[in-house]
Amino acid sequence: MDATELAFTGLARQAEMVRAREVSPLELVELYLERIERIDPKLDAFRVVLGERALAEARQAEGRVGAGEDRPLLGVPVAVKDNLDLAGEFTGDGSAAHRGPVDRDSEQVRRLREAGAIIIGKTNLPELAIFPWTESEAFGKTRNPWNTDRSAGGSSGGSAAAVAAGLAAAGSASDGGGSIRIPAACCGLVGLKTQRGRVSLMPFPEHWHGLSVAGSVTRTVLDAAVWLDAVSGPASGDVDRAEPPARPFAESARTPPGRLRVMVSAKSPIPLVKVYGPAKEAVRETAEVLRSLGHEVIGRNPKYTDVRSSFLPRWLRGIADDANGMPDPERLEKRTRSLAGVGRRIGDRGLRRAREREARMTAKIAAIFDQCDVLVTPTIPHPPREVGRYDGRGWLWATMGAANTTPFTIPWNVTGQPAISVPAPSLHDGLPMGVTLVGRPHDESTLISLAAQLEAEVGWPDRRPPVD
C-alpha cells in the first residue's frame, strides 16, 4: 500500500492495521503531517496543527501497542472541530473573540483519547458555527478539495475538507441545522447527525436549546459507526439522553438491513426554496440503487410541517447565548453581533413556546414513518456554492442564503432524530452531491446498516478529489 492509499484508508481500517502491526502510529502521524504541510495551504482546513504534540502521542501509542493494549482507535490520527475544548489549546470557535487556553478536554475529546485516538489538529468553522459555509474573518476561508473555488460547506467544513483531502482519518463535527450533513455532502463524505442525546456535549448540558448534536465526518459508514461506538453514551449533566442501541453501531454497519420501505422525495420541506436539478438527480439515482438492492421504494412527497417557528427562535437565541459567553464580544464579526442582537430579543417565554411547538411538530412528522422505515431526500438543494458568495453581505442576506441551503436539514434538528448524509452515485460537474437518509427516533442502527449497503454498491470511498 503506497502512502496516498494509506492516507485515504479511513478510521476503521487504520485501527485494524495498527492492531495487526501493519503500520505504526508514528508512520500515520508523519504521513498526515507531511500531507497537511503540502496540501492544506490550498484548503485552510486546519486552524492549528498539533505536530509535536501528535508525534509525542504517537510514540506513546506505539508503546501501548507493544504492550498489547486493545483500544478501538489506538494510534489513529483524527481532527477535531475547533469548537471542542482541547486541554492546553484555545477554542477558537471561528472567532477573534475567543478566550485563552482551556485546562481540560471536552467530553468528546476525552472519549476519543480514551479510545486511543491521536488529535492531529483543530479544524476551522465559521464564527460560532452559525452558517453552512466555513469562512471567517479570523481564520480565513475553507475550500473544497474537489474544486477550490467552491465551499466545503459548514459549519464543520474544516473537518470535512481535511478528511476528504486525506489529511486525517476522520473528523469530529457538530450539527445545529445541518452542519455535519452539509459539509459531508459538499466534500463527498459520510456525515452522521446523531440522535439528540446520543453524544454528550459536556461541558455544555445542551447547545442552541436542543438543536445541536455531535457526530463525525468520515470516508466510510463503518468509520462513522466505529467513531460513534467510541464517543457515544451519557455523561453527568446532560439534558438529553438517547435510548441505547441493541448492538454496537459497528455491528450494524456489517449487517444487511433486510428489505425496507424507503420513501424518496426531492420536495423541499420549507416552502419557496428552489431545489436544483443535480439535487433531484442525486435522489433519483439513489432510488434506483435502493430498488436494485431489493427495497420497496416509494416515490411520495411526505406531509411535513414547517419547523421554522420552532427552529429560528432557538437558533437566534443560541447565537446570542454564545456571543454573550465570549470574553471579548466586540471582536465578533459585525454580522454575528447583529444576529446576536436579534437573538437577545427572544426571551425565556419565547423559548418555551418554541420548545412546545417542537413537541407538536415532532408528533406530526412522526406520521411520515408510519408509511416508511427510512426517508431519502437531497442533503442540500444545490451543488456546493462559490467561496466568498456572502462576502460583505449583512446578517439578513446571509441568513436568507443559509435558509436556501438548509431546508432538508433543519427539520431533523427540531425533532432530534438521526439522519445520515451519504454521497450520491454520480458527481455533478466534478463535484459531489449528497443524499440524506432519515430514520425513526433513536434508530441510527437502521440508517447505518442501509448506508453501508449503499456504500458497497456505489463505492464512494474509492473516489479521490483532485487537490492532491
Give the label of every model feature segment.
Residues M1-L55, A266, S292-G294, R463-D468:
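An N-terminal boundary/leader segment
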Residues R21, Y32, G75, E114, ...:
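Glycine-rich, small-residue loops and helix-cap segments
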Residues E22-E30, R59, P248, G277-N301, ...:
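Acyltransferase
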Residues Y32, A54, A224, V262, ...:
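Residue-level signal for inorganic ion chemistry
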Residues A54, R64-E137:
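Acidic/His- and Gly-rich active-site-bordering loop/insert found
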